[in-house]
Amino acid sequence: MHERYVPADVEAAAQGDWRAADAYKTKEDSQKPKFYCVSMLPYPSGKLHMGHVRNYTINDVMYRYLRMNGYNTLMPMGWDAFGMPAENAAMANGVPPAKWTYDNIDYMKGQMQSMGLAIDWSREIATCKPDYYKWNQWLFLKMLEKGIAYKKTGTVNWDPVDQTVLANEQVIDGRGWRSGALVEKREIPMYYLRITQYADELLNDLDGLGWPERVKIMQQNWIGKSFGVNFGFPYELDGEQKLLRVFTTRADTIMGVTFCAIAAEHPLATRLAQDKPELLAFIEECKRGGVAEADVATMEKKGVATGFSVKHPLTGEPVEVWIGNYVLMSYGEGAVMGVPGHDERDFAFAKKYDLPIKQVIASEGQTYSLDAWQEWYGDKETAVCVNSGKYDGLRYAEAVDAVAADLKAGGFGDKQVTWRLRDWGVSRQRYWGTPIPIIHCPSCGDVPVPEQDLPVVLPEDLVPDGTGNPLAKSEAFLNCTCPTCGAAAKRETDTMDTFVDSSWYFSRYTAPDAETMVDARTDYWMPMDQYIGGIEHAILHLLYSRFWTKVMRDLGLVKFGEPAKNLLTQGMVLNETYYREDAAGKKTWYNPLDVTVTHDDKGRPVGATLNADGQPVVLGGIEKMSKSKNNGVDPQLLIDQYGADTARLFTMFAAPPEQQLEWSGAGVEGASRFLRRVWSFGYGNREALAARAGFDAATLGDADKALRREIYSVLKQADFDYQRLQYNTVVSAAMKMLNAIDGAKGATPAVLRETYGVLLRVLYPVVPHVTFELWKALGYADEFGPLLDAPWPKVDEAALEQAEIELVLQVNGKVRGALKVAKDASRDAIEAAAVADEAFAKFSDGKPAKKIVVVPGRLVNIVV
């Protein structure tokens, strides 16, 4: 054992032992309770960031703690390896996405291994490998057989110059990110999955999940079960009587309709735009906008009047029809009723285009004004109908019932339950993804690839150039034979949404070598006992994975219907930001390591200068670590300088796992200092600690009893904190333990060995390398076995018992001292001891006690 703590040497030694023992390879074991903990698999972007370090350390701590407590634990890892960033990097560097991806995986895997993570690497998967995505294709074909997968046209962003489909984030101000061309919306055939068939189950099953409430609420809102009325505004066009259908949850406001808005793609818009250049121009402008709901929510709301009117179904009055850029054909009926008096978006639209605004609900004590929107205008809870004829005086529910009944009687519509959730479009016009296993035959049409011909292998040697899909230009991939008639045919060149890859990987971890999609091992491990990932995945990934799991269950592949029992959404890692702004308003961001900060006498930052030139930079405040703000900390530099254990200790100590973590260089230094203290104590007392002398707890001296009482008291709290995932307070407990052990005067070697052994086990899940090596060097491994599987220390309840207790002594309600009495002292004995104490004599001014109040176990108050 070396005198000085050298993290690189300690960590290399520990990891060498773990590799030699294949310490983290895990098998099913029916004799133990299982615990399957999974971190969301990373995209192989090139390097780990501190968010990764935090996530994987949380998982690792959980694994090690539960393994010591007798669980059969599993922590796997893989790579979410398909996706657009690889294509972009390939274009920038002139290399195939496969090479870029595999190189990144190799580097990031090395980084993970340097962290000492308890990963069973025999289960590693990469979603870009054929032995994985074969099962994406296989399940897709099963869903096609069951009618869960189907084909229909969908709207995409089309770059007319690059001749390619763009993702929403590649459309910047309506133009393609590479070409700068005005982007068009196009309708193309795509494959969809009927996630809407599972909407009720996806909604109801949230109740049984141990997930954060805000994640459940986000999913509930995304699924969006709505009770309302679907009805039509009648109109006549081209000699035909028709209905412009809308859905509303606010039928109580129907008498306030002053316009209707339709999507640019609505058939009525197309018909009305004939021979109207201004309408055609606006429709084309709308088609250049984003197709995502998020884009519509944030864009400027624009519209144009068609000059056409429909009739109000209850009053017969004309209602003007507008084309609105905020109405999506893919949501609802592609048309909405405009009630500017009681909908904030409609209010703003009406103000902008000078449309009528009618008040048709009122709220007691409130005054309606057309000047500005007020929140109560849209509040159905307090709403009472006014200016609504026969519906006046009705509250929300009563009004909806009455309006729905009248619409039904008139043949215009009825009540309906609708869902915000839409079927999942899985076709992507991209190269680097799972090929969709369909063959296009001129005679037979779309033909599924036979199961025995799976996987359809994606060629890995193509280099995208940004113009079209490389698969469409690859003769070797494209040309094939129809499996039905034998004629020359073409393969589907669309690939699957990468959310498909991440929807079931956790099940494949359980049986990575299976010749089927999953096997019996999957039902042993799944569902995950703990899933760990960022809140940004609360909706799409988590919702799609829940859907995918239910489909697998319904196909008889697994016995469970939810992927994860419990979910932890770890907080973001934050750091200071610094920048300069040029005359044009462009900001240049500087890394905190390149900046010197000055502080006032209270330690608050008051200024900063760039090290390179000594000139000032602006303090931008604390924000999430990101490339764009250049405020990230490279984990590898941290590990190289301080060691993995210091990085792990800081990320666990700085904040509870679910809260944001503010980066602190001083905090890292403090973590390093603490580990040096742990090592130094072990080295400095190595002879005493290595001696395996027993002891009789009943005959121990006061110093030994006091130390054991402190250690086991803290252990009790640390164990509780481990169970509730509050790892920051676990570290605090370990610090208390070290202070107690280091400060113990007169403790015997046997008790020092016992208590230091408790400390090493409490610290081990957080800092496994240094504790593992100390455990081995000081002979604990010879007694208890390697620290990996050493039993978790049990609290010695007898050590917590005290012969004496200390009570606060008050005189006339003011604290004047402390009183030691026997633990089982009677009230009379406590009162006698209190009046005999020198503090009473000193502060009673010679007056006798009038009254003595005893609060058992806490205090004595003498009133004079």
Swiss-Prot record:
A motif ('HIGH' region) lies at residues 42-52. It comes from the Bacteria. Keywords: Aminoacyl-tRNA synthetase, ATP-binding, Cytoplasm, Ligase, Nucleotide-binding, Protein biosynthesis. One of its GO terms (molecular function) is leucine-tRNA ligase activity. ATP binds at residue 627. This is Leucine--tRNA ligase. It catalyses: tRNA(Leu) + L-leucine + ATP = L-leucyl-tRNA(Leu) + AMP + diphosphate. Its EC number is 6.1.1.4. Belongs to the class-I aminoacyl-tRNA synthetase family.
